[in-house]
Amino acid sequence: MGVSKLDILYRRLLLTKLFIRGWGRPEDLKRLFEFRKMIGNRERCQNLVSSDYPVHIDKVEEQSDCKILDGHFVSPMAHYVPGIMPIESVVARFQFIVPKEWNSRYRPVCIHLAGTGDHHYWRRRTLMARPMIKEARMASLLLENPYYGCRKPKDQVRSSLKNVSDLFVMGGALILESAALLHWLEREGYGPLGMTGISMGGHMASLAVSNWPKPMPLIPCLSWSTASGVFTTGVLSKSINWRELEKQYYTQTVYEEEIIHMLEYCGTDSFKMGHEFMNHLPSNADKLTNLNLVSRTLNLDMTDQVVSPKDAKCHKSGKTSISAPSNGQLLQDTAKMECLNQTLSTNKSWFASYNPQSFHLLNREQRRSNRQKESLIFMKGVMDECTHVANFSVPVDPSLIIVVQAKEDAYIPRTGVRSLQEIWPGCEIRYLEGGHISAYLFKQGLFRQAIYDAFERFLHKYAN
């Protein structure tokens, strides 16, 4: 399956640059990785937010068909990883849109998490919440992401997260904040409760539901099993400040000497480093700024089947082109990542054993190429560590999960990563024609229908 030309064009038109200041403080990454181990286990995480966690309503607005409540609470993340959130993000804010009449004795509520660039509430309110009031008498709770809207740091430009670590802070905060809101909704007598989101919002909703100790409808739209592909093989990879990431990786040895060793195995596409990896990369993979970055850099043969790491053996592709793909074809069609994922699992300490003397014998272009490749591997590793759903608990009832995906999504590559159906046996995946942008613009009705279907499935299985 090809990738959407509209996705590629839209990305080129945007000015936003990501991670302009680099990886983030090494101390912060260490704390986040340790915290990820805690929230990756439902038995441990479910007790982090108490069932009576305080939530405050600031304003109630009466409208003809609904009530709109604005509220706030202190993010639990500020208690467990103090000082890691920007001061502007510590107070979580939300908007709750409630119908004046319900269709039955149930009072269903769906929490919507924001996608990339979705500041404040108006998009989700207009495109999802208000139609859901009209179509199904279903309430919606819109949580504002850390780093977005009123929670955006003063020195942040638009949606440009300054550090890679900011994304992990956002994810950890949303998991705990979602738990606080779910507890509050239960206390207020609402139910059934579910979660959804589009793009990044769908992925964050997946992580949040994985830590909820009860069956819950989950409808992730335009998201997949990990964010590593988004930032290494998707069109967003072009918006990343790779030069700063490379520079920091090579000037601060803490990344390869300490942080690498904190990354955990999460399945066949894990980060464990192998000696064979560099041998499979073409020597002229020299421009991370090119849109076809990974079709050159990750030029490896790959199949969709899952291979056990013990039995995994790399095999070279016949004649894989490394020329620029025509008509915007990139990444999924030419980048073959299974061999990468297998070789990465063989030896975690490859960087530690790298011979610096031989490195200095390389010419400048070769050194630059190696820096690019190793920074890319490290990005994949840290993204898988904190965002791969296989590093989190399986939701209590995967049959209540309906995943909506675009067949030609250039933002959320599915090639080379584990399928959600493998990680969450029993979930349903619905595929839409087209790419990420066209689905977001024109398929909102199908997203809402998936929400209604998942809630109906819940009532059929669990209604009293």
UniProtKB/Swiss-Prot annotation:
Signal sequence coordinates: 1-24
TM annotation in the entry: none
An example Gene Ontology CC term for this record: extracellular region
Subcellular location: Secreted
Keyword field contains Glycoprotein: yes
Pfam families linked to this entry: ABHD18 (PF09752)
Domain of life: Eukaryota
Keyword Signal: yes
Swiss-Prot/TrEMBL keywords: Glycoprotein, Secreted, Signal
InterPro entries recorded: AB_hydrolase_fold, ABHD18
Main location class: secreted
Glycan attachment points: N341
Protein family (similarity comment): Belongs to the AB hydrolase superfamily.
Name the record gives this protein: Protein ABHD18
Organism: Mus musculus (Mouse)
Recorded name of the encoding gene: Abhd18
